[in-house]
């Protein structure tokens, strides 16, 4: 544990940021799961609506550095691919 006051403050801030980032990543995963569950159910309209909501969230997480931009692109690409397969 830190002894210097500034180090204690840094530790508090880091823990606070970790919890916030963790909740943001969890939220993103929830949006992705909504799309996946709609696709599995075969509900095209609900899947498209969930996808439209999930994409900006995924992009925001990449912009903020919570996930890598390539991971964001991979998520969006795979979800979109599943949506296209659902239609045809």
From Swiss-Prot:
Keyword RNA-binding present in the record's keywords: the answer is: yes
Domain of life from the UniProt record = Bacteria
| Entry GO MF terms | small ribosomal subunit rRNA binding; structural constituent of ribosome
Q: Which GO terms describe its cellular component?
A: cytosol; small ribosomal subunit
Looking at the record, which segments are called Disordered?
Answer: 1-27
- Amino acid composition bias (Basic residues), ranges on this chain: 7-22
A Pfam family hit:
Ribosomal_S20p
Q: NCBIfam families, alphabetically?
A: S20
Q: What is this protein called?
A: Small ribosomal subunit protein bS20
């Amino acid at each position: 544990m830190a002894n210097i006051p500034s180090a204690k403050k840094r530790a508090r801030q880091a823990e606070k940021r970790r919890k916030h980032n963790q909740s943001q990543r969890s939220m993103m995963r929830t949006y992705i799961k909504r799309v996946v569950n709609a696709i599995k159910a075969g509900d095209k309209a609900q899947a498209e609506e969930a996808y439209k909501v999930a994409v900006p969230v995924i992009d925001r997480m990449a912009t903020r550095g919570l996930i890598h931009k390539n991971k964001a692109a991979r998520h969006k690409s795979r979800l979109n691919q599943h949506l296209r397969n659902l239609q045809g």
